[in-house]
Amino acid sequence: MVSEMTPTRRALAAVLGGRVDYVPPANPLAQTTTELMAICNASWPKAHFDSKMMADLAAASYEVCGIEAARPQFDISLEAEVLGCKLDWDKPDRPPVTGPAYTNPEDVTWPDKLEETGRIPVVLGAIDELRKRYDGMLPIIPLLTAPFTVAGHIAGVENMARWTKTDPEKAHAFIDAATDFVVAYGKLQAAYGAHILFLADPSASSSLISAETYREFVLPAHRRLAKEISCPQILHICGDSSKLLPYIKQSGIDCFSFDTVPVWYCRQVIGNDMSILGSLDVIDLMPNGTPEQVYNRTRECILQGTDIVGTACGVSYGTPLENLRAYVRACKETPIPRYDDVEDLIRQIGVGIGRNMKENVLGGMQE
């Protein structure tokens, strides 16, 4: 057992495949519940434009519930906005892009002083505020929208999907331009004090693209991020990414955050090539389940081999704080399974599933 670690050291060790004292509840998905926003006096859309309010809201889940991460930047549209897209601020929580900004990839440009452009200074200011406030003790894991999603925003999602079939050269050019921008912004986040970058690429979901499309168009961009940004990274892709896993593990990114893939299956396919983060359901379990159910599901994730426990996506506004606290408590109270290799882990999972059925989900919170 490793001696007691700080949240930052624990999260970094887990992301990079090292030893930890317990599986960290370092959730980089959005935790902006109504209760947390009221407690820290944050509101939409102000939290998108004020560095201190952004920092307060990013850290609220740690201060109130013990979740060991702070994630500034709350929307995946900021990058597209900087590149010229308009946003729908009638939906102020996570404003969507209203439409594409470019038809020609050669026209994609951004200002030289990126740190002074759009809402980027707000995010960088929040990172700096959090770094000073916690003296490096709390991992700062800002959102960074990944290239394929950014390309879809600035060129049109339907256009990008069509071009991967009809004009692959144009699709590649837009992705390359988006990657150049994301690398530049990611380097700024790291320079201002981010410990880990959270790469969100929802448009790379297998519900939208095939595994072959991921391999040809998305994987090269992910490899560039891993190579060119000197900061640990977590990649998140929504939906059922099971068919993408054989390629995702070739990306060079440190950790994969998954949605609906079973934990044991993700561990089996990924092996030890990456750390994995997942996966508490946010549709029913987190908003509607009991703390005991959340606790038990967290234990299952740990026993099935996840390196970090987090939610499958951002939690809904009505998620009870007691459910967030139960998830943290389960991480701290569940011993880490020790296995010499992944194959042995999978065999043990089979035994564990049978035992769960017999003992009514691991004996609940009495263990």
Swiss-Prot record:
Its EC number is 2.1.1.251. Gene3D superfamilies: 3.20.20.210. It holds the Pfam family URO-D. InterPro entries: Methanogen_methyltrans, Mtase_MtaA_CmuA, UROD/MetE-like_sf, Uroporphyrinogen_deCOase. Zn(2+) binds at residues 236, 238, 313. Its cofactor is Zn(2+). One of its GO terms (biological process) is methylation. Keywords: Metal-binding, Methanogenesis, Methyltransferase, Transferase, Zinc. The keyword ATP-binding does not apply. It catalyses: methanethiol + coenzyme M = methyl-coenzyme M + hydrogen sulfide + H(+). GO terms for molecular function: metal ion binding; methylthiol:coenzyme M methyltransferase activity; uroporphyrinogen decarboxylase activity. Binds 1 zinc ion per subunit. CDD domains: Mta_CmuA_like. Methyltransferase involved in methanogenesis from methylated-thiols. Catalyzes two successive steps: mediates the transfer of a methyl group from the substrate to the cobalt cofactor of a methylated-thiol-specific corrinoid protein (MtsB), and the subsequent transfer of the methyl group from the corrinoid protein to coenzyme M. Homodimer. Belongs to the uroporphyrinogen decarboxylase family. This is Methylated-thiol--coenzyme M methyltransferase. It comes from Methanosarcina mazei (strain ATCC BAA-159 / DSM 3647 / Goe1 / Go1 / JCM 11833 / OCM 88) (Methanosarcina frisia). The lineage of its organism: Archaea, Methanobacteriati, Methanobacteriota, Stenosarchaea group, Methanomicrobia.
